[in-house]
Amino acid sequence: MPQVQSTVILPPLITSSIFRDDQGRAMIASRRSFARITDAIELPKLIETQIDSFRWFQREGLRELFDEINPIDDFTGKNLELSFSDYEFGEPRYNEFECRERDMTYAAPLRVRVRLKVKTTGEIKESDIFLGDFPLMTNNGTFVINGAERVVVSQLIRSPGVYFKEEKEPTSGRSLHSAKLIPNRGAWLEFETNKRDVLSVKVDRKRKLPVTILIRAVLGLFGDKPLDQCGLNEDVIALFANVDVNRDHQYIASTLDKDPSTNAKEAIMELYKRLRPGDPATVDNARSLLETLLFNARRYDLGKVGRYKLNRNLWEKSRLFEGQEIPSLTMRVLSKADLFKIVERLIDLNNGIGNPDDIDHLGNRRVRTVGELIQTQFRVGLLRMERVIKERMSLQEPEAATPNGLINIRPVVAAMREFFGGSQLSQFMDQTNPLAELTHKRRLSALGPGGLSRDRAGFEVRDVHHSHYGRICPVETPEGPNIGLIGTMSTFARVNEMGFLETPYRRVYREVDNAPLWLERGMTTRDVRHLSTGELIARAGARVDAELAKIIAIGVLNGQLLREDIVNPATGDLIAEAGSEIDRALATKIADLPLRAIKIHPVVTNETDYLPADEEDKFIIAQANALLDERFRFIDPTVSCRHAEDFVQAPIASVDYMDVSPKQVVSVSTALIPFLEHDDANRALMGSNMQRQAVPLLRPDAPIIGTGMEHKAARDSGQVVVARADAVVLSSNSERILVRENDGTERTYPLLKFLRSNQDTCINQRPSVFIGDKIRAGEVIADSSSTQNGELALGQNILVAYMPWEGGNFEDAILVSERLVREDIFTSIHIEKYEVEARDTKLGPEEITRDIPNVGQDSLKNLDERGIIYVGADVQPNDILVGKITPKGETDLTAEERLLRAIFGEKAREVKDSSLRVPNGVKGKVIDVKVFTRDETTEMPVGVNQTVRVMLCQKRKISPGDKMAGRHGNKGVVSRVLPIEDMPFLPDGTPVDIVLNPLAVPSRMNIGQILETHLGWAASRLGFRIATPVFDGARDEDIIKALAESGLPSDAKIDLYDGRTGEKFDNPVTVGYKYMLKLAHLVEDKIHARSTGPYSLVTQQPLGGKAQFGGQRFGEMEVWALEAYGAAYILQEMLTVKSDDVVGRVKTYEAIVKGDPINEAGVPESFKVLIKELQSLGLSVDVLTADERPVELTDSEADDLISLDGINLSGMEKGEL
């Protein structure tokens, strides 16, 4: 039975796990937990939503689609009928790893059994049809599409159903209500009330019409009388006589006054005219339109969810329910009763009865998981294929038709390719570190097809809502335009079969069933356990006779406290008083009484119920920190609870449920922030987001101050290797782990070595078990780049001091010690991929070769005989990685060239150098080279003969300009790397590693970082790691006790000495160990310099951005600065020769090279463009000098421009020069 908070404060628990040091010796990694509350249930598998959803699609989702489309008849319906029956997924041709290597899609062939019936002869033809390769989900919840891992993000959208909304009428201030009926597929119905009490409806967003027209039409459609005798005024008034009772506002009467029709026939015709203006209206046409629009299952589908919401909102909330039969969940189309109920409820709301719906409530928003999103897209492909099949059926002879001849799979394959390659919800996986990967799979997006757009989304939909509690994290969301539209599932949240988010709660028993009630039930529906001890009394499914009913009642009652007197109803004798503890003898007496239920002092059990948001609103729910005694009974008479959107202090007798854990409200990323409860929410948001940007470091180091979530997050991320079964390790090396499982089978776990992630970080797995070790199923046996001993390790534990230092940490700048550089503490590995293809061109095939024209031997020194760089070569910017030549266009040959051609044949043919070179600003070591040729694989794109892929690895040390952050949203940029001897040092001579500015703390209100620093210092002295879970972590007194235990001052401040002078600083300084991250915003990726380079073809101004090797924009405000200083010549230079004076910049460059004086600037190209634009408007523009002489503006011809040393300063592209 899990331990729950009691009146006795427990000492901090020690949780241990075995790991080994660098020499292979077994060590104990202990985390002292300051948690006082133990989670009632274990955390679920964090990526189960993705995996379960895709399995549902494979098992049921596809079956539903084929049932939906079956059967497909030809246009006449008399000749052919085609239907899909069983289907199966074959084995994938390549495994995930091979697909990543070959840039292919990890997919399995989908085969379907198709049955074609020739109706004229009765002949049935069956065959198995290949429906294309269907992308498969990996065990980690991802898809490999064209070699790249992608994630399909779950979408949070408005659920199908009916929604009632309140709006104030501006002139009178009266509340008027409207309703929207949203199906899963089909026409929307929008009902409105105007200030004159007229109810109107819009069908499929067309023109408004009185709602009585629709009511009359529906009465006629389902009536058994002729149309002109149905839907009369008295019929309509009688329908709503029970609800339209307000004499001041007669809604139906007012609407009938505005209704031009008088019976069902006229109403159907009127409806047709409004929906199909211009089409000739006949009764049959009008009737069939209404039927197909709202009552045909192929055109109108509420879906299971739509029907469920409709039943909840209309039937269960109806005050005039009177035992009417609720429509079944399988009834996916509208009924006439549904429409009448909507109008009834609308009139009730207008009369002040009932409440409108809250559209932002999670009971009204559902999650479309990956399986449903794929199903929706697959449906699109199937419907396109159905159209093709019908067309082919009409063209072919029925007897000659075959399933293969009718089916064209291209629409289905294209729909799937379009979804996985181009959908807003199919995203390139964030693989920066394991946490980024895990969080991406748990993300919820309100954007995408059928969702919101970020421009139109208002404040309400983005805001935190009370129904998010335990379902969507209130902290983790992006900053910027997507704030509130993209969220993350909370730690314990799951998606139910309807798509609604659920969260678990512990059941609170306020009364227990007595023997007569158990006997009446006849069978146990679930295991019956003792409420406090969890001891099993009866198993689920047991038949209950009189004897077992008594045993169960005694077993459950034993040990409970009575909440009211027990009186024998037959004699009136008092059996027991309120407050008595029930022993076995008293329990036996009570079980013999004819009482059905016994009220007891509320007991919190470990039975958990997962509740969706609308169900939760009915109950009173206590917080996880409510005080309980050793028998799990509430100690206080009232406890702090939630009830719908209110926080109440409720008597314990009214509590229904209790939270399972303090961290159930937040997401995984937020649950990794220690002392979260001491941080401002804005900073916690930044902390959650920045942890996902942490770059994996060379030597991962798990945090000294953790939250206890590190192990679970690492294990479920998909980047570590987890044992599948209990086993013994036979061998363990850097490449694989071989184990023998308990049943004797041997299994090999291959390890990933220095692989490139989607974000160019390094994925490298290291074994954490050794020969002879016994491992258990689910245990982490190999660490990844950002894990240590199976725990998440995103950063490093660093000794920090909070003090200003000569302006070196002004405005969030960070001063770091050279030790971090020298000892590779914040060094990360980055791997970049460079690829070149040899294609067939019109002038002949390209060739990968070492024989490159106009290239010296020095540039070829690292190339092998094929012209491909060696593995292990160190390369610099502009070095050749792969030599490639491309045929040039034939030109008129001179006599000498013709002679050479005659002597040497094709060898003298002109080729140009198109080699793959290292880009500017990149250097590193080649760690892998792969060559793919058409001979080996047929999967290459058309026209490609050979592909060469080179992997380049860089080791990046921490340097000024790199962004660093803590877990509390405290971010900054490294300003300076200071020699170790200059850093401030402790009295024992230990220099600090980082100096942070104390002014960064008070205004940001993220005090968690200070508490982490204090406790980290104490824990590092005591030699253990700490778990301080969110909302249940170390208190102030715990930190003071830990500081005292480790012999540190109680204020955690100490005298520091200046490393440069050895003098003591004036005041004691806060010092301690803090977990710091290096983020994926590295200065090496951002720093950029240019002298000359490419120019825009139209304006001739330098291009912008590092990717284009562009210049730095000298904008309006910078011009003001030069103007303010009166620097006229610098300003002229900026606007002319440094920008778009084409001839001037070439001449200036030449003058600098030759050491000549620089000539005067010419006319900028942008000025010429302006003149041309004015001339295009029909204006004659002349340019005059100061003395009114005309200036000749000529176009700069390519031939007039000088190009020095092969540098093209003209802005003309290479092919044009």
Curated annotation (Swiss-Prot):
One of its GO terms (molecular function) is DNA-directed RNA polymerase activity. Keywords: DNA-directed RNA polymerase, Nucleotidyltransferase, Transcription, Transferase. The keyword Ligase does not apply. SUPFAM superfamilies: beta and beta-prime subunits of DNA dependent RNA-polymerase. Its EC number is 2.7.7.6. NCBIfam families: PRK00405.1. DNA-dependent RNA polymerase catalyzes the transcription of DNA into RNA using the four ribonucleoside triphosphates as substrates. Belongs to the RNA polymerase beta chain family. This is DNA-directed RNA polymerase subunit beta. The gene is rpoB.
